[in-house]
Amino acid sequence: MARLHSGKRGSSGSTRPLRTEVPEWVSMSAEEIEAKIVEMAKDGKQSAIIGNILRDMYGVPNVKLITGKSVSSIMKEAGFYAEVPEDLFNLMKKAINLRNHLENNPRDTHSTVGLKLIESKIRRLVKYYRGTKVLPAKWRYSPETARLLVE
């Protein structure tokens, strides 16, 4: 599979082992995991970071295998999931930081190209999320509204 904005191939990654039952070495129960997810969500952590913490510090290999629900669905049930999806939010944050950099360094052409690529990816994601009804049909990306959302 190729990279999105280059002709290069992507680096191959390892695949998650196929498991159907919970490993016996996992010490936390499903209720404890859900409580820990809600606790970390209250602290303002994103779902990807919560998954990494559960994996690295608590030895939980796969939340969905143990609880039957994903981290983001547990956060939605508890009311801690944002109205804008996390991948879109992170891209908007990246675009805002790049815009701030370009205000101070207007001749940085490489960053200008990078900003165009990031914003085209944002528009593609917005189109997808509008089609799947995650975002409202009239939701549009603009740098000003993104700055208000992120800050």
UniProtKB/Swiss-Prot annotation:
PROSITE patterns: RIBOSOMAL_S15. Keywords: Ribonucleoprotein, Ribosomal protein. One of its GO terms (biological process) is translation. GO terms for molecular function: small ribosomal subunit rRNA binding; structural constituent of ribosome. The keyword Ribosomal protein applies. GO terms for cellular component: cytosolic small ribosomal subunit. The keyword Ribonucleoprotein applies. Disulfide bonds: none annotated. It comes from the Archaea. Residues 1-20 are annotated as: Disordered. It holds the Pfam family Ribosomal_S15. Belongs to the universal ribosomal protein uS15 family. Part of the 30S ribosomal subunit. HAMAP family: Ribosomal_uS15_A. This is Small ribosomal subunit protein uS15. It comes from Methanococcus maripaludis (strain C5 / ATCC BAA-1333). The gene is rps15.
